[in-house]
């Protein structure tokens, strides 16, 4: 845990540990603020990226804030390990009881982190299976903004795009703009 430390001190500690033959794969650095509870404005989650970049080690987060949101955010920023204190009773005496989680909160934290991990995906932007069924409904078609008569020139004044798909894709807009209509079209009819 790196609470109450600056980057120079953290690098010195890592150097000492690795000089003692501790394999780097067994060394985890946890970004931390040692205030109980830590004010949100002092969390500085962006330091996780600095630790990863500068130390080239597995980096996590030791959370002393109230609630679970900051731990979940840390995971979304690349924290590979989360440490959060657990208590059976928040009313017990001790410096960290208020910022510790009870059983229900801890279960919520784990569920939230697992959901965030699932949401990371593959790094490739593609149409997912869950959204394929909405392609027809959510995509648009080129349609007549008003009645268009055969021979009339397509323009910004008489064409628009609307849901659903099934007609010409808006990607073809420039191909039709300023060309003559080959058919009559009623207002909101898909152009073909």
Annotate each language-model stretch with its function.
Residues 2-192:
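Catalytic cores and adjacent flexible loops of soluble metabolic enzymes
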